[in-house]
Amino acid sequence: MTKDIQVKKLLHPRNLHRGHYDLKQLCEQSPLLSTFLRTNPKGEQTLDFAEPQAVLLLNQVLLKQFYHVDFWQIPKGYLCPPIPGRVDYIHYLADLLGDTFHGKIPEGKQVKVLDIGTGANCIYPILGSQSYGWSFVGTDIDPLSVKMAGLIIKSNVSLKPFIKVQLQANKQAIFAGIIKPKDKFTLTMCNPPFHASMEKALAGSARKIKNLSNDQNNLSRVLNFAGQEGELCCAGGEIRFLKQMIQESKDYARQVCWFTSLVSKSDNIAPLKQQLEKVGAEHVKVIKMAQGQKVSRFIAWSFLPQPQNF
């Protein structure tokens, strides 16, 4: 018996991926997906999410069907992100702007977003531009990520008017060298590196794979899409990265309406709030995003007495 794949129940109300994937329809659009169908203990067919190629094919179908993206590919060894959870961040950012601008979510290119660490997949600029028409500047310290993201943009007429990517030449900086004196951004966003070392990152990936599949021979294949070092880790881990981001953000206090970043570890929220108080942030918000049994969150801060678009 074929079963629709249930997507996490508590995605944002505007998330197009709430409910179930139509497995039959997905396989019709991408016949190769059918080779990754598996039978669960209940005798139902489902997709093998422990197979990286299955996730890649699923993303390609979803991006084409819902976000007008005809070409999307990532190099071997780079992060392959799940679409539903990534677009949730975009929708909650839209809510933040709606609250800021008197209840109306702003759409169009006048909303300018800076995505820190956009990656080879360019996923946040894709989802944000196609969901709300926002314009994006994506940055990354990895030349191949910038090159691949640029290829994705050039290969899709739907993306070219909305997205630019830029190499962050200084690997020790976040905003410095990217935000120019005359630049204004409505938002910055970031999915920061979580781990303090590549060893810890790979161990975390291995645990995740073990939960998805009992086939330990699958581990090497899955790690092909586990992510590069710059995507997964940095010295000091997430907390050090975000403290640096907060410190740097003060230098651009009048050029950005809202600085934001995902925060993977809830224990990091308190020290981040303390850091924001030290640098004089006028407004600080922690916004929770419930996705099934998992609760993620992002922190947002502004130095403007009354945050507004520029």
Swiss-Prot record:
Cell compartments where the protein resides: Cytoplasm
Pfam families: Methyltransf_10 (PF05971)
InterPro entries attached to this UniProt entry: METTL16/RlmF (IPR010286), rRNA_lsu_MeTfrase_F (IPR016909), SAM-dependent_MTases_sf (IPR029063)
Keywords, alphabetical: Cytoplasm, Methyltransferase, rRNA processing, S-adenosyl-L-methionine, Transferase
GO MF assignments: 23S rRNA (adenine(1618)-N(6))-methyltransferase activity
Record bears the keyword Repressor: no
EC number(s) per entry: 2.1.1.181
Main location: cytoplasm
GO CC annotation, single: cytoplasm
HAMAP family: 23SrRNA_methyltr_F
Similarity remark: Belongs to the methyltransferase superfamily. METTL16/RlmF family.
Role of this protein: Specifically methylates the adenine in position 1618 of 23S rRNA.
UniProt protein name: Ribosomal RNA large subunit methyltransferase F
Gene behind this protein: rlmF
